[in-house]
From Swiss-Prot:
The keyword Disulfide bond applies. Residues 608-713 form the CBM20 domain. One of its GO terms (biological process) is carbohydrate metabolic process. Its main location: secreted. The record marks D355 as: Transition state stabilizer. It comes from Bacillus sp. (strain 1011). This is Cyclomaltodextrin glucanotransferase. Residues 1-27 form the signal peptide. Disulfide bonds join C70-C77. The active site is at D256 (nucleophile), E284 (proton donor). Its EC number is 2.4.1.19. One of its GO terms (cellular component) is extracellular region.
Amino acid sequence: MKRFMKLTAVWTLWLSLTLGLLSPVHAAPDTSVSNKQNFSTDVIYQIFTDRFSDGNPANNPTGAAFDGSCTNLRLYCGGDWQGIINKINDGYLTGMGITAIWISQPVENIYSVINYSGVNNTAYHGYWARDFKKTNPAYGTMQDFKNLIDTAHAHNIKVIIDFAPNHTSPASSDDPSFAENGRLYDNGNLLGGYTNDTQNLFHHYGGTDFSTIENGIYKNLYDLADLNHNNSSVDVYLKDAIKMWLDLGVDGIRVDAVKHMPFGWQKSFMATINNYKPVFTFGEWFLGVNEISPEYHQFANESGMSLLDFRFAQKARQVFRDNTDNMYGLKAMLEGSEVDYAQVNDQVTFIDNHDMERFHTSNGDRRKLEQALAFTLTSRGVPAIYYGSEQYMSGGNDPDNRARLPSFSTTTTAYQVIQKLAPLRKSNPAIAYGSTHERWINNDVIIYERKFGNNVAVVAINRNMNTPASITGLVTSLRRASYNDVLGGILNGNTLTVGAGGAASNFTLAPGGTAVWQYTTDATTPIIGNVGPMMAKPGVTITIDGRGFGSGKGTVYFGTTAVTGADIVAWEDTQIQVKIPAVPGGIYDIRVANAAGAASNIYDNFEVLTGDQVTVRFVINNATTALGQNVFLTGNVSELGNWDPNNAIGPMYNQVVYQYPTWYYDVSVPAGQTIEFKFLKKQGSTVTWEGGANRTFTTPTSGTATVNVNWQP
């Protein structure tokens, strides 16, 4: 959804007030810890569980797997869920303004110590799973996990779990004794291992060279045993496992390696979550510096999950850390991503994480990190702070970027930057939901405005550490008043004076200076800021967040279909819960009209699914093509494009599982229904349909299936 809104020209009498006096801060349902669908009002703190705090030494691994000194960063160091609980209870996280934590994958991992190039390695990171239905005992018991959920919720903190359904653990096709042979267990019962895989639980196509999307999906990541999601047992197992963690009360899911799993299976996986207990879900698809991937944005817009915004992270690092781009490049990223993401405010923004060098360098200027944090916390999206950033941790690539947290100081400037800015996401909807507009710029300085209705925040950053910036001609949407810097001057910010028409008085922004000024007011007409989940079947309750909905029930529209009465589960001024009506599957615009009939903005790209989803692999043989021509699939349901060649599924693959002239693709389709479908060849705008009658297939009610047919001339 594009959130550029018209500026208003309604001005008040001259006031010398800060925002705190202009508008009192009050709790709203959209900002509640119970809102599992919307994280735009939250600040996430990513915790590598083993490296955060050791709250229970009794659960530390023994022998070669453990290094209490944390000298070998590839061994366990002792961090656990009790340690996180302790740091919630003592106020370290809440004092920083953190309202969501993202923890390492909680499932049971392998116990083997693997020697790579003379260095012992363990599953301290949580990504070498063996049983997705049990806990990693080094982190804690199932009761410890429940205690973490309860403690976090009692302190208004949501809990996101990492989840890695792409693979189990390292394995060797030649040596079944290597590590644990990638074995997969179901609550303690062995399902199978990588060698002698008679049940076809895993892929066996060798390791990926990352040359194509297909190559990365169906071949192993390094030596990790790659799960076969087209296997019904694997499919049902993983979906049952995530339901178990949802039942335990998790509020969000980060899905690892989404680029390396079938997109159709992932859509059915998301449908399972959204049709069961929907929570905010985001995936990891790595992008390099200056990389813009159409497939990346298509996944974000069509899979039902958001993404870690690597495009944002890489550009922020270029501009604030490495000085390899300037503020015009930053502006271009913000404006370009606004177009490419259907819901830009749902993407998870960050400046570093466990898969890249830490932002701060050992001898680097701390102000660079502080400015990057301020930028992330006030920009569109859902900000995620990597543990230790507030303590200026440095470190190169894995494992040096995963060291033990050295301190829990609450007096660092970085901690205080987070502390002062994080609450804005709940108190000012311009930060949570607003559009972004550049208001003043040169190579080293950017002043941008976030705006939602008449709520406004203005952010000024001068990355030049030696030269002040003379700011003249600045015009904002702030009302006529004098505004104190929300940061309180800790980054050398200043007061901003705004006159008639939003014109700011000239001022000097100090070298390395950063300031935030804001204004809030109540909305009198409805404005939608967030909808979640963005994909589900009829009858599922979704959450609409925003402002100005009023206290009495109005109407929610899915396209032209009006929903009123009992199908509106709850209606408050900042949040509506509504059941998806019984409309045909497809893409819909959502809008709201309050009880007085005032209409909201349109929130677009909502997908109504035809029903519950399963994954079907469609295989077409003998489909020869000309150079530049590809094979696609369409059919009579929205999941297959409703017979529209422009919305057909594909291009299909033809290199790994099957080879040309056989093509294949894994597709999410309605469960337990007889569907019609056909294949077609496309080259640009030229479409060639296969002959014969429409094909039919009755999909399974659960699990997966394969359709294997020949091209009809």
